[in-house]
Amino acid sequence: MIENIYTSRILILNFGSQYAQLLVRRVRELGVYCELRAWDITEAQIREFAPNGIILSGGPESTLTIDSPRASPYIFMAGVPVLGVCYGMQTIAIQLGGKVNQDMLRREFGYAQVVIIADSPLTRNIQDLINNNQPILNVWMSHSDNITSIPPDFIIVGRTTTCPFAIIANEKKRFYGIQFHPEVTHTCQGHNILKRFVLDICSCQGRWTPNNIKENIINHIKEQVGKENVVLGLSGGVDSTVTAMLLHYAIGVNLTCIFIDNGLLRYNEASNIREIFSKNLSLNIIYVRSEDRFLRALAGIYNPEEKRKIIGRLFSEIFEEQARSLTKTATWLAQGTIYPDIIESAISHVSLTNVIKSHHNVGGLPNTLNLKLIEPLKNLFKDEVRKIGLELGLPFHMLYRHPFPGPGLGIRILGEVKKEDCDLLRKADLIFIEELYKAKLYYKVSQAFAVLLPIYSVGVMGDSRKYERVISLRAVETIDFMTANWSHLSYDFLELVSNRIINEIDGISRVVYDISGKPPATIEWE
């Protein structure tokens, strides 16, 4: 029997917090389904979602600003527990009769200690240490506004030396506010506080597990598609790979995958995909060799944004050409869209933020094929997709490979993209990755790759002078790829990689290491 994984559900309202997606992931890690919606959600939408509990996220605005976001009044009449985090706590206070002020002497950014001064189901028996018989929580604060008086029927549960209302509660209505961020790892007991709210106070059941998700998706595909045929663009990345396997388990030979070799892939990528999917997994795959077509289109193009758009447009055109030959039999187009793509796409429609780079995962495939769309992963985060991949029997090394951008080497070769440059870069990148594996560092860094720079440098090989290309190595460590630190790889390791690249690859005279964080730099160079 397939369990209903959506029986228990938490609704998280986004007030603009940089940690909003992380908050969703933390709840799902508890085995409970939840969704992130905009703060201005309507009463009808809340009723339709029917949450067991509601969490109000933090946000960058001041609650004192005119027209600053407010929660729907219905939230406080829905009869379910509510937890306000940072800004979410402050809007609860204002909307229910409390007061908020901005006191520069009481603002807190970074580490703080919350002293628990009253018993509450939210924090009972949860502490990092005890001082004078009082439990203490080590937390992460990020606020300028402060509550100066709490609403009627609320009590103070916790305080810091500068914030007298760090945790507040209305136990009768099960309304709670915390001034700190439980979703970040810096708040040591954040997991336990969220667990207490979600599982105990909201009485949710933990049915959101990788195996249950897998079985539900496969069953849903069978019901949705039936005996009809599906076409999928297969890239070899995690999302399209897991999508292909879910469809394969659900509809078998009725799935046809299209793999486009654009000449911008990693070393032996195309042959590895053919080996894994066609021979080992018996998927029906159409292979399209299009290297010459992509390189011709990229000839003379130096602007990175233009390169991204050309690669995306050409991929879409070639996919459409191949898919049209299947439209007599196929009625569905599958995509490996994941939940962050949906969230970011929705945000972009209302955001005034400047586009830093074109995103290569959203809206990339043609909508002119008159095929129905199926997106099996659209409710999942990347870490959930990987866990489902393991449930499907896919190898760990395939699922946990470092991210590879949609435009491929096209944005790791700075300037014009040529075949000989792709070959140089592939070899350098392979050496870097090989040595990371040998040193057992590959899974300790979040992403690592080589970049071919558009400059030449003088070198000496034996008694001869050479004037050849420069490679930059890039390795970063990150949790969410929104921010990243450069990896402090040892000098000995970097020397080993540099020597191998220069000695083994004809055409490289110098290797440098990128020590830029994000921000100010982006992870990819283009």
From Swiss-Prot:
Disulfide bonds: none annotated. InterPro entries: Class_I_gatase-like, GATASE, GMP_synth_C, GMP_synth_GATase, GMP_synthase, GMPS_ATP_PPase_dom, NAD/GMP_synthase, Rossmann-like_a/b/a_fold. Coiled coil: none annotated. Pathway: Purine metabolism; GMP biosynthesis; GMP from XMP (L-Gln route): step 1/1. PROSITE patterns: GATASE_TYPE_1, GMPS_ATP_PPASE. Its EC number is 6.3.5.2. It catalyses: XMP + L-glutamine + ATP + H2O = GMP + L-glutamate + AMP + diphosphate + 2 H(+). Keywords: ATP-binding, Glutamine amidotransferase, GMP biosynthesis, Ligase, Nucleotide-binding, Purine biosynthesis. Catalyzes the synthesis of GMP from XMP. NCBIfam families: guaA_Cterm, guaA_Nterm, PRK00074.1. This is GMP synthase [glutamine-hydrolyzing].
